[in-house]
Design a protein with these regions (language model features):
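Sec-dependent N-terminal signal peptides
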Residues: 4-13
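C-terminal motif of bacterial Sec signal peptides marking the signal peptidase cleavage site
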Residues: 15-17
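Bacterial lipoprotein signal-peptidase II cleavage site
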Residues: 19-26
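Positively charged n-region of N-terminal signal peptides that target proteins for export
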Residues: 1-4, 276
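Extended, low-polarity segments enriched in aliphatic/aromatic residues
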Residues: 27-81, 86-327
């Protein structure tokens, strides 16, 4: 397939458009590639994974959000099925740290069944038997990342995220899916409270420091990235459909005002989240296809700070080379 490559010098401050040359100065590392397709289908999901050129070896975890009861925006079994089958993967999730139908193991398994993931796939609720701690490089707020004990059962992770808004983080993509998503219920509270509590009810005492929460997400995402880099590896995919201002953890999300855009994939989690943000922020609104509500949600929560901090601590690059696999 013929591919067109573009350099995207990613800067939300200037909302710069993609363009330029893929060459860097002598001695500089090449920019990470972010692959893009405008087609959202089971076939294109497999194709964009294959474009990454990485073989999933060993026991493969496919990290998705199973979606809160009542939510219809989560990535559906029929969409992800071909990729999961190709990988021989197991869908992995953890319990939540808020009231709903996924904060207990019993209720979460029922939601998993109701949303069609069982019996279609092997599914592992990674913290149903407890938590374990993995190290983080950035200990400014959190001192470790508390994840489900079953994470140790996997050698390779496909971080398959639904890109959309989020009531607390501003937006959710692969960084959130790696941090809050992989954290156990106690670990979620620990990240939300920027290292102050493991309690689901107590975490709300600490929501006043938004940047500390966002920085804790970046640190936890780096912990998960490092964990799998030391094993067989990790890849990152963002699906840009049903882009409500609300997350899949919301049982009654707002209707999307922005039309579906496509799928992005990369080996660099910072680059792929930044590429999605750039696409949203550079979108030109038309009737029935308006980015304003999603941008307001992101900016009102300072959501881009998660990406900024992730880049600052060395998790990845906000500059990237965009590769359109449709061309």
């Amino acid at each position: 397939m013929k591919k067109m490559t573009l350099i995207c010098l990613a800067s939300l401050a200037t909302l710069s458009a993609c363009g330029g040359s893929s060459k860097k100065g002598a001695g500089e590392e090449p920019l990470p590639k972010v692959y893009f397709t405008s087609e959202i289908s089971p076939e294109s999901l497999v194709r964009i994974y294959e474009a990454l050129g990485v073989e999933a070896k060993g026991r493969v975890a496919v990290k998705i959000s199973t979606g809160e009861a009542g939510n219809t925006h989560y990535l559906k079994p029929e969409f992800i099925g071909d990729l999961v089958d190709k990988l021989g993967g197991t869908i992995v999730e953890c319990n939540t740290a808020y009231m709903g139908k996924r904060n207990t193991t019993e209720d979460h398994w029922q939601t998993i069944r109701d949303h069609g993931f069982v019996p279609r796939f092997k599914v592992d609720l990674m913290d149903e038997e407890g938590s374990m701690d993995i190290p983080v490089q950035d200990t400014t707020h959190i001192k470790f990342d508390r994840v489900g004990t079953h994470l140790a059962n996997y050698d390779f992770m496909v971080n398959l995220a639904h890109f959309k808004g989020h009531a607390m983080g501003g937006f959710g993509g692969v960084l959130k899916n790696a941090s809050i998503g992989v954290a156990s219920s106690a670990g979620k509270a620990y990240i939300h409270s920027w290292g102050n509590t493991f309690g689901m009810m107590e975490l709300w005492d600490y929501v006043y420091n938004q940047d500390a929460f966002l920085e804790s997400m970046a640190a936890a995402a780096q912990g998960v990235h490092d964990y799998f880099k030391a094993k067989n590896g990790i890849v990152y995919i963002n699906v840009m459909n049903n882009m409500s201002v609300d997350c899949d953890c919301d049982g009654h999300p707002a209707a999307p005002e922005l039309l579906d855009m496509g799928i992005m994939a990369s080996l660099d989690p910072v680059a792929v989240d930044q590429a999605c943000l750039d696409m949203v922020f550079n979108h030109q609104a038309t009737e029935g296809d308006d980015e304003a509500a999603l941008i307001e949600r992101i900016t009102s929560r300072h959501g881009t700070h998660t990406v900024d901090h992730a880049a600052a601590i060395g998790l990845g690059s906000k500059e990237y080379e965009l590769v359109n696999i449709d061309l």
